[in-house]
């Protein structure tokens, strides 16, 4: 029965894609050539000089091991550093969650995301000013908002640490921009604008030239942090929506070795600090993942992907240049969103296995 459903879905999906006709330009496979040597990124991995990581986790969904995720995030980028978890009201994004469904012993952060981020920024700022070791601030998803605010604050702080004592790394920043694109919210709300959603109430930070080296780690097709440049491409929007659901949080548990060279871009700002983007490929298109789950063979779904991916990739401006386009799908080394730590499957098991759901 699952294969019947999968077959029907595949026929509909390919037919839907074909209905776009020539309105979606086809993109070509990536060409392994990059013009000229780019600036060198700040050292990560075993070369990292950070001795401590100030870790800020994402939105604390009821039932997930938030502290465990937060302590693991960025560990492959800074493997030799001890983790100092910066606690803040990370559950604000779920302040609307029905209390009857909260796991026993949990609490609810009844405030807006904007207030929670301000709280986290103050805590991070305090840790940075009292720290003595070279440090890296790491933000996973919502935690990246805290890093954005703190960088803007430190940019004009005469008591800020020296540039060689601190760096920032965001994983899946839902309000940020990066060398290969931008987040969903950044495409809607410019710097300084207010997000008027009741439980969010967050003001986008002004863009500043930070004195600190910065890394942005993003999953390809993650609709939160890597939204299409051309949202009229509905196929790409649908793919990004599924990508946001399954490939957003796992980005925090990847390492620099998961990123091919053409997916790393570094720029130098007016203050001499580097900003490096690491675009992590996925192992398959998120849009067709249900087909694999429903029983279609990888070979069959790969054929469908070969039809859909050029149309989806045409929605991203980074693919316009045939010589410099990055790799978005790597079946061998790409991120597997269903088996990585922080996956939606793992999160669902944690939630449904809680006593609130009879687990």
From Swiss-Prot:
Inactivation phenotype: Mutant accumulates DAT in the cytoplasm and at the cell surface. Does not produce PAT.
Organism whose genome encodes this protein: Mycobacterium tuberculosis (strain ATCC 25618 / H37Rv)
Pfam families in the cross-refs: PE-PPE
Biological process terms in GO annotation: lipid metabolic process
The entry's keywords: Acyltransferase, Cell inner membrane, Cell membrane, Lipid biosynthesis, Lipid metabolism, Membrane, Transferase, Transmembrane, Transmembrane helix
Hydrolase found in the keyword field: no
Annotated compartments: Cell inner membrane
Something else known: The topology of this protein is unsure. According to PubMed:25124040, the C-terminal catalytic site is on the periplasmic side of the inner membrane. However, PubMed:25331437 authors conclude that Chp2 has the opposite topology, and that the C-terminal catalytic site is on the cytoplasmic side of the membrane.
Assigned protein family: Belongs to the mycobacterial PPE family.
Membrane-protein topology: Single-pass membrane protein
Function: Involved in the final steps of polyacyltrehalose (PAT) biosynthesis. Catalyzes the transfer of three mycolipenoyl groups onto diacyltrehalose (DAT) to form PAT.
Sequence intervals crossing the membrane: 4-24
Activation and inhibition: Activity is probably potentiated by the DAT/PAT transporter MmpL10. Inhibited by the lipase inhibitor tetrahydrolipstatin (THL).
Name of this protein: Diacyltrehalose acyltransferase Chp2
Enzyme kind, highest EC tier: transferase
